[in-house]
Amino acid sequence: MIDEFKTISDTIGEGYYTEKRSKFLAFAHHVTTVDEVKEIVAGYRKKYYDARHCCYAYMLGSERTEFRANDDGEPSSTAGKPILGQITKSELTDILIVVIRYFGGVKLGTSGLIVAYREAAIDALAHCEEVTQQIEEIVTYDFTYPMMNDVMRIVKDMNPRILDQTFDNTCSIKLSIRKSEAEQLRSRLKMLSFE
């Protein structure tokens, strides 16, 4: 069971590539939602309003199933796809790479564009800090007050993060634990009910 994934830190990775007087500025961001992607891309379009193209690609989610590549007026699959290819090759997720192109007056051709966008993305990724994050699952358990010591012994033993707890005649605890250990935690807590 996969219970971790690779992403980048919150520090923006910046890259640069130049080819036949065209300049490619690349920026890699840690993102978690499509709304965040839209906001960042809109910000770059506004900041670099005089640039010819603002191409990007992103991948979201621990399963890496939500992704998109945008060519922003470049010939089909010459900008967004090479950027996405670098994200895929690096096995990263929760990432957005934006590449701004300033046209230098000389056409690069499709292969030249593919190389330029790919190299700009590679440079941005080279200036990022890669981090591994755990996939966690929430476990909620309701119990009676006399069971408190047994529940807390399991919590101490398995070391989940305590998100919320209520202690009264009827108690409740909400825990966050690594996905691969969640079933074991549920099973151990459930066994307390039968003792």
What are these language model-derived features?
Residues 1-78, 164, 182:
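C-terminal regulatory domains involved in ligand/effector binding and gene-expression control
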Residues 27-30, 137-143, 170-177:
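Short cationic amphipathic helices and targeting signals
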Residues 48-51, 158-163, 190-195:
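A common structural junction motif
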Residues 54-56, 130-139, 165-169:
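Interdomain boundary/hinge elements
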Residues 67, 74-108:
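Ordered, amphipathic secondary-structure segments that act as subunit-interaction surfaces
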Residues 96-99, 106-150, 154-155:
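Glycine- and Gly-Pro-enriched alpha-helical subdomains that act as flexible
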Residues 151-157, 184-193:
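Short amphipathic alpha-helices in soluble, non-transmembrane regions
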Residues 175, 181-184:
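Terminal, non-globular segments
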